[in-house]
Swiss-Prot record:
Annotated GO CC locations: cytosol
Family: Belongs to the SmpB family.
Organismal lineage: Bacteria, Pseudomonadati, Pseudomonadota, Alphaproteobacteria, Caulobacterales
Annotated compartments: Cytoplasm
Record's keyword annotation contains Cell cycle: yes
Gene this protein is translated from: smpB
Name of this protein: SsrA-binding protein
Length: 152
């Protein structure tokens, strides 16, 4: 896995990520060229079930600058490519258990294909977010204290 094109940094703060999946994305040529320039935003996006498919909604891939009038729509719905068993598992979790599909990271794989890391997630309540923030602060303070004790 190479350097991410786009990351959803709020995903791990707002949700408990139970399981992650690597999904391909159906893109047009101008979308691929726009991604190659490193321009994308998945912070406000989510994945949803439409029929027996899973689609990425509200992901922003800006229009390619050197394209002609056949450029793509920036926030169109994009189909995610997963194995049928994975799709069925995700559909069951979303519809029966009330889980959410959250995009975590958009990146190029070793073969040069655009991949999306999707997390099967459960929403956090406000007190869970506070607990997460307190734990993160404690880990930071602990690391700072350990660093101070090292060379004295």
């Amino acid at each position: 896995m190479s350097k991410p094109i786009a990351e959803n940094r709020r995903a791990r703060f707002d949700y408990f990520i139970e399981e992650t999946f690597e999904a391909g994305i159906m893109l047009t040529g101008t979308e691929v060229k726009s991604l190659r320039t490193g321009r994308a935003n998945i912070a406000e996006s989510y994945a949803s079930v439409e029929g027996r498919e899973i689609v990425l909604i509200n992901a922003d891939i800006p229009p390619y600058g050197h394209a002609n009038r056949f450029n793509h729509e920036p926030r169109r719905h994009r189909k995610l490519l997963l194995h049928r068993r994975q799709i069925d598992k995700l559909i069951g979790a979303v519809q029966r258990e009330g889980r959410t599909l959250v995009p975590i990271k958009l990146y190029w794989n070793d073969k040069g294909l655009a991949k999306l890391e999707v997390g099967l997630a459960k929403g956090k309540k406000l007190h869970d977010k506070r607990d997460t923030a307190a734990e993160r602060d404690w880990q930071r303070d602990k690391a700072r204290l350990m660093k101070g004790d090292r060379g004295d």
